[in-house]
Amino acid sequence: MGYNKALRYSRHDGTSCVIDNHHLKSLGSVLNDVRHKKDRIREAEYEPILDIANQYMVTEDPFRGPGKNVRITLFKEIRRVQPDTMKLVCNWSGKEFLRETWTRFISEEFPITTDQEIMDLWFEIQLRPMQPNRCYKFTMQYALGANPEYVAHDVIRQQDPYYVGPNNMERINLSKKGFAFPLTCLQSVYNDNFERFFDDILWPYFHRPLVYVGTTSAEIEEIMIEVSLLFKIKEFAPDVPLFTGPAY
């Protein structure tokens, strides 16, 4: 007996025979629809918040935000680091800056020559191994909220440090929340009072970092340490119009 279309539905009331799956859905598709419905409900809840948030602009990385970066190289120095220990990079004392290994910011001129508004301050450290073909990583620990009268130890034991970032370079933001830097004439202040430049000018408005560096090597290693301060300077809009020509 061949297939007959008329036999798909029974003529008797209350009984039916479904042959095709046109009106059926898999359980997976049903669960997927439920998940999409939950996502739409969640998006509807966030829409008012997103409308307000879209009115503000923020940077994913504050270092790459608006402004001009001016670098001041404090020193370059070779130091020996014992295994399982970490050495203090600098204690920010005036006597330390007057050593022969520390030149006056490498150059005699302060790079910020005009009156500029300081927006941010970064501590940058670059580490390099002095011997070739050495397979170890650089480790680092730092503290920002130390008491000004606290005397930091020169050497500490490694305990839960973290690895220095890519290219063996690390940046630390020294800005204090709610503290604006009032001075704009940094060059004159630096030239007048170099020995007290940090204690009197910078640290009242920025964090004084205590930075320790070490290695994962099991031997004594000689490393090159380069320390810099990066000033984020506000770039003012030019006085001339941005567009010139017959249409303007």
Curated annotation (Swiss-Prot):
Coiled coil regions, renumbered to chain: none
Cross-referenced Pfam families: Polyhedrin (PF00738)
Xref: InterPro entries: Polyhedrin (IPR001746)
Annotated GO CC locations: viral occlusion body
Family the UniProt entry places it in: Belongs to the polyhedrin family.
GO molecular function list: structural molecule activity
Role: Component of the virus occlusion bodies, which are large proteinaceous structures, that protect the virus from the outside environment for extended periods until they are ingested by insect larvae.
Keywords of this entry: Viral occlusion body
Record's keyword annotation contains Repeat: no
Protein name (Swiss-Prot/TrEMBL): Granulin
